[in-house]
Amino acid sequence: MTLDLQTTIEQAWENRANLSPVDASAEVRDAVEHTIDGLDLGRLRVAEKIDDQWIVHQWIKKAVLLSFRLHDNAVMGQGPLQFYDKVPTKFAGYGEAAFKAGGYRVVPPAVARRGAFIARNVVLMPSYVNIGAYVDEGTMVDTWATVGSCAQIGKNVHLSGGVGIGGVLEPLQANPTIIEDNCFIGARSEVVEGVVVEENSVLAMGVFLSQSTKIYDRATGKVSYGRVPSGSVVVPGSLPSEDGSHSLACAVIVKRVDAQTRAKTSINDLLRA
């Protein structure tokens, strides 16, 4: 079934300029809808870790992009929260039984789009989770945090207030941003452009990471890009230019996570009781 979906999506992608809400075959519509349903239920993922390597399923990302060409804007929502969009909200039509079955908590006015997967024991404070995102078990998405399209958030992650996790749709990116298990992302931090924050890492408040951000390891003096090694404690910093005339912002790995640092983040358990 998945192979058939992939083949149909790949063929439709090559013909995407000719697709519209009134000009698309039933086969293409069904393939896109099945893919979005799979994302919504967590049966499909844009990226998954296989043998310790993140594998990106580009065809699934293409299905997400194609879905925007197959639908017109429509009024959705209820009460004071009315929207005009092409993608319905994930929780449209949910009653108490559906929320209990999902096993997560959604605090108003949190919004998740259909096609985002929310796992059990996730807490969505007033936040936004975009289509194609995957939020794994036990994660807290705090107030005004944003999980971008197709972003992958691991288990027991805390995305603090105002955190931005970049998406892949606008601007178009090749790979999703990934936050692995047991990470703590400090308030107002931004992680974008397919950067990977490996498991058990802690980002202090106000850390900004893109593919062009220098990541300086204080212990080794080495500079890297695009990936925070597992167990890192990262703070905002700056590095001087070669001639010393100016400095540019960077992220600094100040140490590896120890038991004391992890203990400080366990306060999140109190917020979920």
From Swiss-Prot:
It is an enzyme of class 2 (transferase). GO terms for molecular function: 2,3,4,5-tetrahydropyridine-2,6-dicarboxylate N-succinyltransferase activity; nucleotidyltransferase activity. Pathway: Amino-acid biosynthesis; L-lysine biosynthesis via DAP pathway; LL-2,6-diaminopimelate from (S)-tetrahydrodipicolinate (succinylase route): step 1/3. GO terms for biological process: diaminopimelate biosynthetic process; lysine biosynthetic process via diaminopimelate. The keyword tRNA-binding does not apply. GO terms for cellular component: cytoplasm. Its EC number is 2.3.1.117. It comes from the Bacteria. It is found in: Cytoplasm. Its main location: cytoplasm. PROSITE patterns: HEXAPEP_TRANSFERASES. It catalyses: (S)-2,3,4,5-tetrahydrodipicolinate + succinyl-CoA + H2O = (S)-2-succinylamino-6-oxoheptanedioate + CoA. InterPro entries: DapD_Trfase_Hexpep_rpt_fam, Hexapep, Hexapep_transf_CS, THP_succinylTrfase_dom1, THP_succinylTrfase_N_sf, Trimer_LpxA-like_sf. Homotrimer. This is 2,3,4,5-tetrahydropyridine-2,6-dicarboxylate N-succinyltransferase.
